[in-house]
Design a protein with these regions (language model features):
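N-terminal accessory segment detector
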Residues: 1-91, 100-120, 127, 133-146, ...
Length: 239
């Protein structure tokens, strides 16, 4: 098994546990801040690629320029992300019925961490992509039969703006060039939480991040934690 959705979830879960156990409500606030920080960076990378390709920052473009796709690991386990669209206009609403992140948080007995994570992730990705998209996560799989996500202002219009161009598939770079593998996503997640913890809590935050790295090594193997260290100096705003 390689870098995948479940390791991505595990990283967030361990930061949640260590931050809240060490710093209480301050730790929870730091976890939310770091989740938003991570997600907004991801959304900005998507937006920069779209702008390079001459695409408008609409919800259609957002969907086309998403950075991840289900891994073979999750497909083989039967828990790859599955969703169904229930409306497209004026509000785009879809329901997620199977999610590997939910599966991992549940396996770890950390549904509370999953609730907090999922409440702040996707809306923050959208905010990084275009803050005028209105993205709401009104329920999640952690406490409901399915996750509900709703998006309005689908054109991403700013106040006073009346129209945007349409997404043009012919202008889009190859799909593979819009994606990043889960090695990258896991590294981005780890270093987002680690950097935010260090900036907020100083030496104690740096020590906490090192302990999460030890958690990863113990649960997944030293090769995973060692690989994450290779990204220590990376600028995750860059595309």
């Amino acid at each position: 098994m390689g870098f995948n959705e479940k390791l991505h979830a595990y990283i967030a879960a361990r930061f949640y546990v260590r931050l809240t156990h060490t710093f209480g409500e301050k730790g929870k606030a730091a976890f939310i801040y770091a989740t938003q920080y991570y997600a907004e960076q991801r959304g900005r990378r998507m937006a920069m690629r779209a702008i390079q390709d001459g695409q408008p920052l609409t919800y259609e473009t957002y969907r086309a320029y998403g950075e991840w796709e289900s891994t073979k690991d999750m497909q083989e386990e039967g828990c790859a992300n599955r969703s169904e669209t229930v409306s497209t206009d004026p509000v785009y609403e879809f329901h997620v019925t199977v999610c590997p992140w939910h599966e991992e948080f549940k396996t770890l007995g950390l549904e509370e961490a999953g609730l907090v994570y999922c409440a702040h992730l996707d809306n923050s990705i959208a905010r990084g992509f275009n803050p005028y998209l209105v993205y709401e996560v009104t329920q999640t799989l952690h406490d409901c039969p399915f996750c509900v996500q709703k998006v309005s202002n689908l054109q991403g219009l700013a106040p006073g703006q009346t129209a945007q161009g349409a997404f043009d598939p012919a202008k889009a770079r190859p799909e593979a060039d819009r994606r990043r593998g889960f090695t990258y996503h896991c590294a981005h997640s780890y270093w987002s939480y680690a950097r935010c913890a260090a900036r907020i809590f100083g030496r104690a935050g740096r020590q906490l991040a090192d302990e999460v790295l030890e958690d990863i090594s113990g649960e997944w193997g030293a090769s995973y934690s060692n690989f994450l260290l290779k990204y220590k100096a990376d600028d995750f705003e860059m595309i």
